[in-house]
Amino acid sequence: METADMVKVAVSAAPYSIDKPYSYLVPESLAAAAVPGVRVMVPFGRGNKESEGLILTRVQEPKLPGSKAIRQILDPEPVLDKAGIDLALWMRGRYFCTVFEAVKTILPAGLWYGLREIWSLAMEPETARSAAVGIPGAWQVLDLLEKQGGKADIRVLRDALGDGAEKPLKAMKKAEILTCETDAKRKIADKSHRMVELAVNTEDAYALTEPKRRSAPARYEVVNFLATAGRTPAAEVSYYTGASSRTLKTMEKAGLIAFSEEEELRVPSLDDVEPGPEIVLNEEQQRAFEEILGRVQAAKPSVTLLHGVTGSGKTQVYLRLVQETLALGKTAMVLVPEIVLTPQMMRKFSSYFGSRVAMLHSSLKMTERYDQWKRIRRGEVDVVLGTRSALFAPLKNLGLIIMDEEQEGSYQSENVPRYDAREVAKYLCVREKAALVFGSATPTVETAWAAEQGNYQKALLRRRYNENALPEVLIADLRQEILNGNPGLISTPLRQELEKNLAAGEQSILFLNRRGSSRMLLCGECGYVPQCPRCSTAMTYHSANGRLMCHYCGHSEPAADTCPECGGWMKHVGAGTQKVEEELRELFPEAGILRVDADTTAGGHEEILQTFERERVPILLGTQMVAKGLDFENVTLVGVLSADISLYVDNYRAAERTFSLLTQVVGRAGRGGKTGRAVIQTYTPGNDVIRCAARQDYDAFYESEIRMRRLRRYPPFADLFTVTVSGTEEGRVLRAAVSVRETLRQLCRRPELAAGEPEVLGPAPAPVVKVNNRFRYRCTLVGKNDKATREMLAWLQKDFAKDSANRGMNLFVDHNAAD
């Protein structure tokens, strides 16, 4: 059989159920440009609709009857190299996504194409009308096309004609009255400005313009200016010489000057940053730095947990590691969990590395992200700093990845592909023979376990950098506050501490923990929270049916009005930051108060925090974004308004997250030369997690938590795969989820899976059962994250999509989901 020059293409239109590399012929006219990593337009499916794709590889294959050819090359050069393509293929196998979904995650949004379907007349209008006789609705389409000049975007046709456009369009295309083409347009174009320079040497330019200096003074002024300034933007030449654009064009025609285009990069600006002082490490920091640097120098893959108490100076260690990594001729990535932390960290790193640092996160303008990507790709950047998406920056010769606050759930994507940045970072370090550093005061239980087992290295920072003691912590019992006649949001101990700070001119941070607040029941007298008898997680209250439900195993029971432990009244817990702010203003009418929460814009976060630091505003109130990473030397008091809310949510990580959050927020106090204090308000003052956090005792928390995880087969002792079914009809979704559970149980009996002792739980409603008018039910598979399990789940997802009984419903798989 005859072989042909072909390419394997990842096609954007292919859903996960049929996703694979598709073979396409390479026309001779496109042969030179059809290389791996460029995007193409290809016909796809029975209707040969044009779709975007990415060339994965070029091969010689048998030319089969009906083979299709690529139609258009979209990129002048590859947007992904082999390493990027390999990463996309790895993500497909790991995170149950298509190759093209992985590609879109890796590339900046500014590189994406928008596809437009353009319908055009294939003949003269009158001829078209004659040919369209007998086609219902054809004349309305033809009238509209004539008004649009003979062609129109499908969206224009649908807006005008509604659903009635589809049938006549298809019929007229079949009759060759109309043609349909797909136009691809980049979402963001490169920006450039027009430059001007002399096209002849200076002496000749003066010789040509000096004689006409009186009659054409502008020409002489242009020559005089360019002779001094050299190549200059055309707008500046006009501004300084008064020459019009017409004058410049005349000079170009005369051969005096030449125009050219120069790229203009749109880079996010920072205020002027002063050079940073010399970094001096203490003995503990120096030891940790030398240990990790040795692994960077060894050029072998490694993972190190840098476990340091809050305020121990992990950032100084990061800076020194990056300095030495760059001295070795390598590059570095530094990841932070929250966008709000990026500008503060960026200023620190810019003070040492200047313009060789690039910042990447989702709140940058699309144009800025795209231009930062270009700088990185060209090798103009040595250090990339940003949130989890910064992992996909095309850095060459990577030597170091630092993941600060590695315990944060924001390192796990909630959108397809549902990737875990920690896993992607480990993949990159293996590929690049680089060192990975997980930095945290409260590492995840899985990370601490891996270090304990010797799978990761470990470096410890047990003391604060400034030698200050950790903050003194007072636990305020909210049950007693109610009994004492104070039902408000600010307890008496916290109010008294705030008064002390106001009198001393020191600052305070108040943290409101809002996660899960609207779904929690709690006894206001004894602190009892209803828990699932099987899963040891708090149950979620559903107001629609007045029941409590476990979102792991599906256990359900009526929600009681009174506490089964003490007979007290059960109450819904949760208040917003605005309500807290109102109470604060009543208590302290003269005090300045700033509020930062999810309603604050991304740029507003930074502005508020800078105002808090610069103007020493007495009180900062906020949610998650004030809990970590912030470093203000005049903050001596931290108040946690409700410690219980994140502790009693239906997630196996609830205790870990609460301990981490409390430890982090308490650690914001006393970071300058003054002693810090903290007040933790709670309905359950005897809870071990809250007591451990108050003592900043990670070891005690870890020992307790690891015992519970082992008993319940939670990570790291097993993996949890969440299989979610969604659709618009709740009954159908629930029946499909029951069917999925039975299929899973049958599949898990296979020998290659049974060895991992898999267990299938559910179905149960998702924590938020209805989103965008779609109901969601899920099963949980407890087992091993190995190749056999992933292949089985991939098959299940594809089989579900192919079954016509499941039309209108979706199934997706998540691994150790954050929620």
Describe every region a protein language model picked out.
Residues I593-L594, L747-A766, R807-H815:
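Short beta-strand elements
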Residues R39, Q60, G756-K787:
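Short, intrinsically disordered low-complexity segments
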Residues M1-S440, T447, E452-N468, V782, ...:
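Accessory, non-ATPase domains that flank or precede helicase/AAA+ motor cores in DNA-metabolism machines
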